[in-house]
Each structure stands twice: as structure tokens, then as C-alpha cells.
Design a protein with these regions (language model features):
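Sec/Tat signal peptide C-region and signal peptidase I cleavage site
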Residues: 21-27
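Bacterial N-terminal signal peptides that target proteins for export
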Residues: 1-13
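Mature N-terminal segment immediately following signal peptide/propeptide cleavage
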Residues: 35-55
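Catalytic glycan-binding domains that act on GlcNAc-containing polysaccharides
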Residues: 53-265
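Cleavable N-terminal signal peptides
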Residues: 13-15, 25
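Compositionally biased, low-structure terminal segments
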Residues: 4-5, 45, 89
């Protein structure tokens, strides 16, 4: 628990960051392409300093590159969650997630028993999210995390949403939980279950290293508990908590169905 005290500091900082953002998002001029990115970064550095980001985080910001691949992926988000829940589950390999999830539930029984006794969250939903997000850790992404999340904070579509996560990513760099070279998913998500940086600050447990399986799964349970998970109600009785994880209806329904199938074996 070398990071225990630091972890409490990170959580407190995360709560403050996530409450800040409406005004901060407007402090630097957003853009719709790479042309203004470097100028924006210089302005955003002042925003970051004001939020408490220190030298390592500011250095990571200075080194961030405009992430064209992230912008392309962001433009396609709605399409990825279109169609019926059945077609979505088929595209995402739900039957494989269920089969492997059942196997992992057995082979990691001690871990899932600990998670359930600590957080009240049943194994199925954790396994469903883990399988859906990264194929149980098989692919956690190759996009530079700082560049991705900073680009999204700069982009004019949703700066109010992504600015707190950009600040959080820089704070995580300051504290050593991320580095300027850390990689993850296209929208800056991190680790086995793909937390956005602000959620790492607020809900991550222990040393916040979400590339560690146990830390990631316990952090996921902590997130769900904080979003109203009701022990004993099962996944389908906890749609509100699942909605906190992902706002897409087809995703929520798929997770609930997969979780129920895993827990009901």
C-alpha cells in the first residue's frame, strides 16, 4: 500500500476537478482541427495550473500531440451503439464473453468473493464489463492517453465533458499513476475496464494502477456501488448503476443480460 496516502489525496483532488469544469472548459478556445491545437495547449496550461497540475503533468501536456485517430473514433461513437440490443450483443461477441466469463468467475473465485463482500457487487456485472471493454484484458488500447484526452478537451464537440478528464490525466501523471507515454483506448480510457481519468481519481482503489487486474476490477465495483448498486438485486435490478458506467441503452441492456447469464450458471 505504498500509494495509500497518495491515493486519498488523488480521490480528493478528483472530486474537486470534476466539480470545476464549466468555466474551465471555456478558458481556452476550442477547435475543430489540428491547426489551433498548439496555441490552445499554451492557454490550457494556465487552466491546468489553476486546477493544481504540477510540473510533470504540465510537461506531459506540452508533449501531447493532436490525436486525429481519436477524433475519427469520436465521430463514430453513435454508430457503434446503434441497432437492437441483439445485434449489438452479436457484434460484441456476447456468447464468448458469457462463456469465458463463467470460466474466469470460477478460476478467480477468491478475488470475486472479496469484491462482493467488500462492495456488494456480484461477479457477473464485473465480468460482463471486463469482457465487453477489453476482452478480459486482451486489448487495452494503443493510443497515447494524454494526447487522446487532451485532444478531446480541445475539440469543440464536448469540451465541457472532457476537460475535467484531461485535468485528471495530468494530475495522474504528476502522481505517477500515469506517464506521458501511457497508452489506452481512443477516448483516453485506461486499464482492464477502461476508466476515464477523472473516474480513476474518484473511484480508483489502492495505487490506481488499472492495468493491474485486481485493482481494475475492485475499482469497477467501487464505481458501481457509488452509483447506487443494490446488493442482491442482480444486474437487471441495477440498471441505474450500469447507466452510470455507460449512457448507451443497448450497452446497458447487453451488460445486464450478459451478467445475468454469467451469474445464473
Amino acid at each position: 500500500m505504498a500509494f495509500f496516502a497518495k491515493g486519498k489525496m488523488i480521490a480528493a483532488a478528483g472530486a474537486a476537478v470534476l466539480s470545476l469544469l464549466a468555466g474551465m472548459a471555456q478558458a481556452a478556445q476550442c477547435g475543430d482541427g489540428a491547426a489551433g491545437f498548439e496555441e490552445w495547449k499554451a492557454d490550457f496550461a494556465n487552466v491546468a495550473k489553476g486546477a493544481g497540475v504540477k510540473n510533470k503533468g504540465l510537461s506531459a501536456l506540452a508533449g501531447a500531440k493532436y490525436a486525429s485517430a481519436t477524433i475519427k473514433a469520436d465521430r463514430a461513437v453513435k454508430k457503434a451503439f446503434s441497432g437492437s440490443v441483439e445485434s449489438f450483443m452479436q457484434r460484441r461477441g456476447a456468447s464468448t464473453i458469457i462463456s469465458k466469463g463463467r470460466s474466469l468467475k470460477k478460476s478467480n473465485a477468491a478475488l470475486f468473493n472479496k469484491i462482493e463482500s467488500t462492495y456488494g457487487v456480484s461477479p457477473g456485472v464485473i465480468l460482463a464489463i471486463w469482457g465487453m471493454e477489453t476482452g478480459f484484458g486482451g486489448f487495452m488500447g494503443k493510443q497515447n492517453t494524454v494526447s487522446a484526452i487532451v485532444t478531446l478537451a480541445y475539440d469543440c464537440r464536448r469540451p465541457g465533458f472532457f476537460t475535467p478528464h484531461a485535468i485528471a490525466a495530468l494530475m495522474l501523471v504528476d502522481r505517477g499513476a500515469l506517464s506521458a507515454g501511457s497508452v489506452g483506448a481512443m477516448h483516453g480510457e485506461i486499464g482492464h475496464t477502461q476508466f476515464l481519468p477523472g473516474n480513476v481519481l474518484k473511484y480508483g482503489v489502492g495505487n490506481k494502477n488499472l492495468k493491474d487486474k485486481s485493482t481494475a476490477l475492485m475499482s469497477t465495483a467501487n464505481f458501481l456501488r457509488a452509483h447506487g448498486w443494490n446488493p442482491g438485486a442482480g444486474a437487471e435490478g441495477n440498471m441505474g448503476a450500469i447507466a452510470g458506467w455507460n449512457s448507451a441503452g443497448v450497452y446497458q441492456q447487453a451488460i445486464a443480460r450478459i451478467a445475468t447469464a454469467i451469474d445464473g450458471q
